[in-house]
Design a protein with these regions (language model features):
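Phosphate/pyrophosphate-binding catalytic cores of soluble transferases and nucleic-acid-acting enzymes
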Residues: 1-304
Length: 304
């Protein structure tokens, strides 16, 4: 028997968390967070992490997993999420997959096999070859090894060419093999995939309000504390939306008002990219908050 999963995706500030909590309370569910920044400890305000009060209402999984100077791959996330989903279902509860990181959601509900971690040696070896022979020579090798992948990569895209070759060198398998399941549903799940898609003017207003609230709650102080305890401002976790602008403010590159406006502008851009991602996903249903009650009635068959 397949495990029923309800996915609630959508852009930042679209209302995913509140909707998921409301539905999980009604359906006796638990939430599996799919947010690539909420996995970090100590980064609460800038990632709009569910509050302790919200987490006391409904269990939230895959939040506060790693430290800001650590990393997690989509493959590692996939493994953890599937283990948690199995556990939630075994206890007679409904798993809710909730978040704005589309790649994380896709990694869980599609039949994707991720390549193993590759030793840094291979990347250095390829980099040295590029320096000696030129990027064109290395790209030509990729065309012979994995023409499917090469056909999707610009001959000037050094990062993706390097990634494709390092996987092949390390595993003996073209990276295209690992991407075959990208449009195939994971066979153990029965998924309802919903995407909150509010009108742009409403979404942008919510973004403005959210950023203002983050400042009121202490985003500046949270960022300063992360730096004070020794985390480098160059960490990928701290070079994300909100934190990077506040770091520039703390360095004297912005006044606070300019930093806040920059966060709002970049958040709007990020939300637009998220919306595009979700609209291009397969087997999704776009809904507005106003339609949620009708949609809930349709999916209430998931109640145990």
């Amino acid at each position: 028997m397949k495990i029923p999963i309800i996915v609630i995706g959508g852009p930042t500030a679209s209302g995913k968390t509140q909707l998921a909590i409301d539905w999980a309370l009604k359906l006796d569910g638990e939430i599996v967070s799919c947010d690539s920044r909420q996995i970090y400890k100590f980064m609460d305000i800038g990632t709009a992490k569910p509050t302790l009060e919200e987490r006391s209402l409904i269990p939230h999984h895959l939040v506060d997993l790693i430290y800001p100077d650590e990393t997690m791959t989509a493959g590692e996330f996939q493994k953890l999420a599937r283990e948690i989903i199995k556990d939630i279902h075994s206890r007679g509860k409904v798993p809710f997959l909730v978040g704005g990181t589309g790649l994380y959601i896709r990694s869980v509900i599609r039949d994707i096999v991720f390549p193993p971690k590759v030793d840094e040696y291979y990347r250095k070896f390829i980099k040295d070859r590029i320096n000696r022979e030129g990027l064109g020579s290395v790209y030509n090798e990729l065309c012979k090894i994995d023409p499917v992948t090469a056909g999707k990569i610009s001959p000037n895209d050094e990062i993706r060419i390097t990634r494709a070759l390092e996987v092949y060198y390390a595993t003996g398998t073209p990276i295209s093999f690992y991407r075959k399941g990208i449009d195939v549903d994971y066979p153990e799940y029965e998924v309802i995939y919903l995407v909150l898609n509010p009108p742009r003017d409403i979404l942008y207003r919510r973004i403005e309000e959210r950023v203002d609230k983050m400042i009121q709650l202490g985003l500046v102080e949270e960022t300063r504390h992360l730096l004070d305890v020794g985390y480098s401002p160059e960490l990928s976790s701290l070079q994300t939306l909100g934190y990077r602008e506040i770091i520039k403010y703390l360095k004297g590159m912005y006044d606070l008002e300019s930093a806040v406006e920059e966060i709002k502008k970049e958040t709007r851009r990020y939300a637009k990219r998220q919306s595009t991602w979700f609209r291009n996903e397969i087997r999704v249903r776009l809904i507005t908050y106003e339609e949620a009650e009708d949609v809930f009635r349709e999916i209430s068959r998931y109640r145990k």
